[in-house]
């Protein structure tokens, strides 16, 4: 029984941590509860909070663009259908109008009045649709202005941070590196250097 428990604890300790994309499961050991635990953030250490917020704003902007495009396509489909219905009714009305008034039957006169009323209602409906599209366009312009102001405010501190980090890197490059023997890096070391402090271009 003790052997099984010892084996179970050993296997549990060697069990690899799960990964969810760039997020690694936090290591949790029962025997270390009394000591200080190293908590690793779920976010990539190469991104600052301002950069994360800016990236989220860009994603939100992309989502809004897709929603707008869907709305535009719906407006277009409704407008095409309304125009088609109006043209069909007008064609039928023209055929009735071409008949001399004295030769028209009572049903034909009633149908002519019905067509005029239907065409009038459809024209009004299309006018409402055009007005709604114009209101939507003005609202989108206001949203674009607000988003542009937001991005401009958020990009200013990031530009300062980028310039500061670039100048610090330039100062570091100016210092001569200490001489040390050349050692060939393994694949794991190359990956670590590639994805350490800056975002990997390959990823």
Curated annotation (Swiss-Prot):
InterPro entries: bMERB_dom, C16orf45-like. The gene is Bmerb1. It comes from Mus musculus. Residues 3-149 form the bMERB domain. One of its GO terms (biological process) is negative regulation of microtubule depolymerization. PANTHER family: BMERB DOMAIN-CONTAINING PROTEIN 1, BMERB DOMAIN-CONTAINING PROTEIN 1-RELATED. One of its GO terms (cellular component) is microtubule cytoskeleton. PROSITE patterns: BMERB. Residues 161-184 are annotated as: Disordered. It comes from the Eukaryota. This is bMERB domain-containing protein 1.
